[in-house]
C-alpha cells in the first residue's frame, strides 16, 4: 500500500480531530521505504519487456483523437529524440509502471520535462516561474516526475551538442529538488502553498547565476511581460466587417461550424459553476463573439482545443479563453488505477495543489461528451528555448526546474516523507544520473523505431521525417543475452546514428514545428 504525502483526490475529507503524522513519523515512514527499493536501485532502467513496441504505445494514445491531425502530431514528434520524448509521456509512464518504486506517493505533474516549466502572471501581474502543464497530473510515485525531468535534460543536452554537461545538469536538478524539499520542510502548510518563485530572480538564496543565464532569463521575462491579454488579443484577432473576429491561420487555427461554436459557448455555463463566486462575477460583463479551433503542443496534437473571444465593455475590453480537452492521465493508466475525478477537474485540482499561484479563470466543463478545462490564453506566458540552454545556462536552468519541482511536490503534500527516503541527496543525484543516461539511450532507440515506422509507411507524418537509422533499433533478445557487451556497444552506435540523422533533417523539421506544420 503506497504512503501518500497528500490528501486523496476528491472529495476531500478533513478530520480536524485527527492530527497529521509528526515529522519524525513521516521521516521514519520514508526511511522504511528504502527496504522496498534501495536508493541505488532507483537508478536502474531495464525494460520489463524486450519486445515492447514503442510505436504501438505512442500511437494508441491517438486512437480517440481527431484523425486528420495525427500526421501533424507525428511530424512534430519526429523532429528529434527530445521532441519525441515530449510527445511520449504515456510511453515513459508505461515503462516506469513496469518498474519497482518507493511506494511514496505525491501529487505529480505527470509530464515534468523541462519544456513544461515556464513563466506566467500572478494576479498582481508579477511574472512567476512554475510548472505550467498539468494534463497528466495525478497522485503517483514522486520519483517519476524527477526522472522525467532529469532525462529531458540529458536529451536536450545531446540535441544541443552539450552532452558533456548533462551529468552536471542532472545532478544539479536532483540536488536542487532536495534543497527545495528541505526549505519547505521548515515551513507550515499555508506558507508552503504560497511560496512562489519570481521569474526574474534566482530561485534560492545563495544561488548565483552566470552572466549567460542572467541574460537569457532577462530576455525571456522581458518578452513574457509584454504578452498581456491586450497583446494576445492583438495577435489572435482581426476586424472583419467592423467586428472583432479570431484570426484564422490553418492548420494551427481553423474556423468551426456554427453548431460547434454554439456548443462551446454553451459549455461555458457549467464552467462558471466550477469557479468561485468572485471569479464568476468577473465574467458577468462578457459575451462570446467568436470561437475557433487551435492545434497545441506536441503530445496534445489531435485533442480538441478551442479559443473563445469574449467582449466586455467595448473593443478595448476583450478576453481570450482556452477550452482544452483533458484525457485520462498517463500516470493513472500506468498504475492501473481508476480516476476519481472528471479529467478536466483533475487537471484543475492538480494545478491548484502544485502551483504557487494559478490562473484565476481556471475551471472545468464538459463538451462533445468529453472533459475539458478552461483557462486564459497566454497571459504573460513565456518559456525557455531548449536550443539556447548551453553550458552554464543548461546547468542553471536545471537548478531552477529541479528546485521548482521540489516546491510543487511540497505544496501539494508533506516533504518529510520524501526526505526520509532520500536523506542528504547524494545517493539520489547518482541514481538520477544513471537512470537518465539509460533512459535517454532507450528514448533514442525508440525514436529510431518511430522514424523507421514513418518511412516504412506504418504511420503517417505531415512532412517527411528524418531518415531512418541504417540499423535496426533493437537486437534480438537471445543475441542480447549471449553478448551483453556487444548489445551495449550496438545500442550506443544506433543512438548516435539516430542523433546524427535527426540533426541532418532538423532545420526543415524545426520550421514545421514552429509554424504548426504542413496541412494534414
Residues of each region from the PLM?
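Polybasic, lysine-enriched low-complexity intrinsically disordered terminal tails
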Residues: 1-13, 21, 28, 35, ...
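Compositionally biased, low-complexity repeat tracts
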Residues: 6, 26, 89, 230, ...
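Conserved ATP-binding subdomain of kinase catalytic cores across diverse folds
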Residues: 18-109, 114-225, 270-467, 471
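Polar low-complexity intrinsically disordered regions enriched in Ser/Thr and small residues
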Residues: 33, 237, 245, 409, ...
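Long, low-complexity segments enriched in small/aliphatic residues
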Residues: 197-267
Amino acid at each position: 500500500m503506497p504512503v501518500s504525502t497528500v490528501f486523496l483526490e476528491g472529495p476531500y475529507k478533513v478530520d480536524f480531530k485527527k492530527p497529521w503524522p509528526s515529522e519524525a513519523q513521516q521521516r521514519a515512514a520514508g526511511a522504511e521505504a528504502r527496504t522496498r527499493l534501495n536508493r541505488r536501485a532507483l537508478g536502474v532502467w531495464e525494460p520489463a519487456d524486450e519486445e515492447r513496441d514503442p510505436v504501438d504505445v505512442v500511437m494508441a494514445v491517438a486512437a480517440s483523437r481527431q484523425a486528420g491531425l495525427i500526421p501533424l502530431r507525428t511530424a512534430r514528434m519526429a523532429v528529434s529524440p527530445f521532441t519525441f520524448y515530449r510527445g511520449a509521456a504515456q510511453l515513459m509512464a508505461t515503462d516506469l509502471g513496469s518498474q519497482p518504486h518507493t511506494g511514496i506517493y505525491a501529487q505529480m505533474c505527470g509530464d515534468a520535462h523541462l519544456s513544461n516549466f515556464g513563466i506566467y502572471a500572478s494576479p498582481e501581474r508579477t511574472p512567476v516561474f512554475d510548472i505550467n502543464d498539468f494534463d497528466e497530473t495525478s497522485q503517483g510515485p514522486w520519483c517519476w516526475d524527477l526522472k522525467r525531468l532529469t532525462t529531458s535534460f540529458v536529451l536536450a543536452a545531446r540535441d544541443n551538442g552539450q552532452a558533456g554537461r548533462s551529468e552536471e545538469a542532472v545532478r544539479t536538478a536532483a540536488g536542487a529538488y532536495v534543497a527545495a524539499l528541505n526549505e519547505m520542510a521548515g515551513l507550515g502548510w499555508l506558507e508552503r502553498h504560497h511560496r512562489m518563485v519570481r521569474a526574474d530572480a534566482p530561485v534560492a538564496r545563495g544561488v548565483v547565476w552566470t552572466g549567460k543565464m542572467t541574460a537569457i532569463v532577462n530576455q525571456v521575462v522581458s518578452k513574457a511581460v509584454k504578452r498581456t491579454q491586450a497583446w494576445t488579443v492583438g495577435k489572435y484577432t482581426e476586424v472583419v466587417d467592423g467586428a472583432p473576429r479570431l484570426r484564422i491561420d490553418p492548420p494551427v487555427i481553423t474556423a468551426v461550424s456554427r453548431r460547434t461554436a454554439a456548443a462551446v459557448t454553451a459549455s461555458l455555463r457549467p464552467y462558471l459553476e466550477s469557479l468561485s463566486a468572485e471569479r464568476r462575477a468577473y465574467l458577468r460583463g462578457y459575451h462570446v463573439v467568436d470561437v475557433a479551433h487551435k492545434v497545441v503542443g506536441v503530445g496534445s496534437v489531435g485533442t480538441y482545443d478551442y479559443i473563445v473571444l469574449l467582449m466586455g465593455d467595448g473593443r478595448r475590453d476583450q478576453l481570450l479563453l482556452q477550452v482544452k480537452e483533458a484525457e485520462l492521465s498517463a500516470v493513472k493508466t500506468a498504475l492501473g488505477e481508476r480516476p476519481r475525478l472528471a479529467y478536466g477537474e483533475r487537471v484543475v485540482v492538480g494545478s491548484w495543489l502544485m502551483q504557487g499561484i494559478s490562473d484565476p479563470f481556471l475551471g472545468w466543463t464538459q463538451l462533445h461528451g468529453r472533459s475539458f478545462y478552461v483557462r486564459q490564453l497566454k497571459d504573460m506566458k513565456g518559456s525557455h528555448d531548449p536550443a539556447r540552454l548551453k553550458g552554464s545556462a543548461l546547468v542553471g536552468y536545471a537548478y531552477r526546474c529541479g528546485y521548482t519541482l521540489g516546491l510543487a511536490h511540497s505544496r501539494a503534500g508533506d516533504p518529510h516523507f520524501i526526505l526520509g527516503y532520500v536523506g542528504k541527496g547524494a545517493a539520489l543525484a547518482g541514481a538520477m544520473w544513471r537512470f537518465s543516461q539509460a533512459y535517454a539511450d532507450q528514448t533514442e532507440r525508440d525514436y529510431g523505431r518511430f522514424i523507421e515506422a514513418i518511412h516504412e509507411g506504418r504511420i503517417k507524418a505531415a512532412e517527411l521525417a528524418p531518415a531512418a537509422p541504417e540499423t535496426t533499433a533493437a537486437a534480438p533478445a537471445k543475441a542480447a543475452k549471449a553478448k551483453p557487451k556487444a548489445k551495449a556497444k550496438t545500442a550506443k552506435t544506433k543512438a548516435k546514428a539516430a542523433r546524427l540523422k535527426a540533426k541532418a533533417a532538423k532545420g526543415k523539421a524545426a520550421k514545421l514545428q514552429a509554424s504548426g506544420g504542413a496541412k494534414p
